[in-house]
Amino acid sequence: MRSVVIVTDAWFPQVNGVVRTLSTTKAELEKEGYQVTVISPDGYRSVPCPTYPEIRLVLFASKSVGRRLSGLQPDAVHIATEGPLGLAARRWCRAHRFPFTTSYHTRFPEYVRLRAPIPISWSYAFLRWFHGPAHRMLVATQSMENELLSRGFKNIGRWSRGVDLELFTNDSQHQRSKPPILLYAGRVAPEKNIGAFLELDCVGTKRVVGGGPELKALIEKYPEVEFVGYKHGPELALEVRQADCFVFPSRTDTFGLVILEALASGVPVAAYPAPGPLDLIENGHNGWVSEDLNHAINEALKVDRDACRKFAERFSWEKCTAQFISQLRPVEAN
C-alpha cells in the first residue's frame, strides 16, 4: 500500500485542529514514502457555511469527486469529514465496493445544536448512517470511543494526536507572572465556550490568542481581556510558553491539540471534564479538570511545569501516523 487519498471539507486557509491534524499527517505519510492526495474544497465551486464562513461547502461535487477517485485508483481512502466532499467520496466508495475509513473530529451533534434547533438524536442518527459502512471510524481518545459506543456506533479504531516538541518548548527558568497569565488560544467561536472563561472572577490576566466569528462581540463585552489575534509558529509558541495556566473551556472538542501544545510548553491546563481533557489531564500532575473552572485554574497554577512537559513528550506525530496507517483498509484487502 503506497497511495492514499484523504477527503476533507476542512482545509487551508482554515486555522483549526482538524486542518493541523490532516496536514501534519499528510507530511508524515510523505516522509514515509506514501503518495498522498488530498481532495479538499480547492478548485471546486463552493459557498460559505452558515455560521462558520471560513468553511466552504462544495456544490455539485459528486461526479467530479468520483472521477478523481476513479482516475487516482488509490490503495486506500480516508474520509475525514461528513460534509459534501465526504458524502461524495462515501457514495463512490459504496458504489464501487471500495473499502474506506472515516474519522470523527468534532462533536458534531452538540456543535449543530448550539446553532440550530435540531435534536441531537437526529444528528447522531445521521452520523451512524455516515460512518456505519466504514472499515474503521477513527477517534482520538478512549472517552470519545466510550461515548460513541454508548450511542450505537461500531467498528471504532484509535487515532491519537501528536505535538511538535521542537516548536513548543518549556522554559525551565519561567517565573510566574504577577498576576498570573491565564491563556486561551484557538478559534473564537460559540462552540469553544470561551465566555465561560472570560466571565470568571479570578485572579489573573486573561489573554486570548486567535480569531473567529465571536471575536468582535467578546472584545466589546470584556474590555479588560487582552485579545491579541491570530498567532502562528514561533509567535504562537512564545505566547503559550509565557502563560502560567492554559484554560480550555470547550465541551465540544474530541481531543484538543492546543492542550498538548500547552503541556509541551510546560503550561498546566484547566478544563471541564469533557472528552479530550479527561484523557489528557491528570489532576495535580499536569493540570486540573472540574465543573468549577475557577477551581480548576487555581489548582492548575500549583502544578509543576516540568511534569507537564514530560507528559507531552509521550506524544509524537510519528506514532500517531503509524496508528493511522495501521487502521487503513487497502483495496486489496477487500
What residue ranges belong to the model's regions?
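Nucleotide-sugar donor phosphate/pyrophosphate-binding loop at the beta->alpha transition
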Residues: 99-101, 110-129, 139
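Donor nucleotide-sugar binding/catalytic pocket of nucleotide-sugar-dependent glycosyltransferases
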Residues: 125-171, 177
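Short alpha-helical donor nucleotide-sugar binding micro-motif in glycosyltransferases
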Residues: 131, 230-231, 238-243, 324
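Conserved donor-binding/catalytic core segment of Leloir-type glycosyltransferases
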Residues: 174-209
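Nucleotide-activated donor-binding/catalytic signature segment of Leloir-type glycosyltransferases, i.e.
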Residues: 216-234
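Aromatic "clamp/platform" in nucleotide-sugar-dependent glycosyltransferases that forms part
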Residues: 251
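Short hydrophobic beta-strand element within catalytic cores of glycosyltransferases
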Residues: 259, 264, 268-271, 281
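A charged, aromatic-enriched C-terminal amphipathic alpha-helix characteristic of glycosyltransferases
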Residues: 301-332
